[in-house]
A protein has these predicted regions:
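Repeated scaffold domains used in trafficking and secretory/extracellular systems
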Residues: 1, 25-38, 66-78, 104-116
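Solenoidal tandem-repeat scaffolds enriched in leucines and small polar residues
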Residues: 1-4, 10
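Residue position within the beta-strands of beta-propeller blades
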Residues: 4, 42-43, 82, 119
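Short loop/turn segments that connect beta-strands within the blades of beta-propeller domains
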Residues: 6-8, 15, 36, 48, ...
Length: 139
């Protein structure tokens, strides 16, 4: 199968060249796409809102919902990450916010290496993990 991305939709073509499945962007603009971990993650922009869409490898919707404005999306086995102007945001498969990690410079790209998230910003590569629980609030 081949995944083709057009201005207004994603199309999955079979070995014979026929269209097997498609997903319409609904008038939104494609910002970013990631095809790791058994499916497709789309980041769409529709004016003031950004939408994250998780599709399985047959382009069936697993999740679709509004998310903070971002420049990149990374599909993980257990959810997805968004790279914004100043943070990395983590969401589970149901689109529920998990954590945020501030970055010193704007994240320009990210790579998932197994369960490790590597983020490129400025001239550095940084491994990003969930923040440690705040122990100062424990009494």
């Amino acid at each position: 199968s081949v995944l083709a991305l057009y201005e207004d939709r994603a199309v999955l073509y079979g070995a014979n060249g026929g269209e097997k499945a498609s997903y319409d962007f609904g008038g939104s603009t494609l910002v970013d796409v990631d095809t790791e971990n058994g499916g497709v993650a789309l980041l769409l922009s529709g004016g003031q809102t950004c939408t994250a869409v998780l599709l399985d490898n047959g382009l069936n919707v697993q999740y679709s919902g509004n998310v903070p404005a971002a420049s990149h999306i990374l599909r993980a086995a257990d959810g997805f990450y968004l790279l914004t102007d100043s943070t990395v945001e983590c969401f589970n498969k149901a689109g529920e916010f998990q954590w945020t990690q501030p970055m010193d410079a704007k994240p320009q790209a990210g790579v998932l290496n197994g369960r490790q998230l590597l983020v490129f910003s400025g001239n550095t590569v940084q491994q990003v993990t969930a923040p440690e629980p705040d122990s100062s609030s424990a009494s």
